[in-house]
Amino acid sequence: MGELLVAPSALLVAVTVLREGLSVRDPQTVATRVPATRPSRFVTVSRAGGQLINPFTESVLLIVQVWDDDKVMGESRAEATANLCVGILRATSGTWVGDARVRRWEQNALPSYLPDPDTGIPRFQFTGELRLAVK
């Protein structure tokens, strides 16, 4: 049997990075799903596939959504938070998150306004690829 190479959890890495980065700049909940009791502001991260681009690097497509239900400032604050999240993810390139090595964050789509169709809550969404070392 050959060497066993296992990819780290991309969701755990992304949620950890965003929680830590936002905690000192713009504190709010970061989760992999919409919380049952919605806070007024929160961020969700979901995995939308990906690929093994070589034997040592996994490229995981992530969808990040930023929500803010403030009737006056929600849209502009959600956009600002989405832009901050992009910067936080970009800054992880070449770092370690726990025992996971982040090779880089590659943006696929900039934040786009996408209000929640059920509630009308302002929401911005962006996508990108988190490239992680497989070990």
Briefly describe each language-model feature range.
Residues 1-54, 92-98:
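Small/polar-rich, solvent-exposed N-terminal microdomains that initiate assembly or binding
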Residues 1-13, 48-57, 100-135:
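Short, charged interaction patches at domain edges and termini
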Residues 39-41, 58-62, 122-124:
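A generic structural signal for short beta-strands and their flanking turns/coil linkers
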Residues 66-72:
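Structural beta->alpha junctions
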Residues 69, 90, 133:
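Residue-level marker of positions within ordered structural domains that often coincide
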Residues 72-94:
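Mid-chain, well-packed structural core segment of small domains
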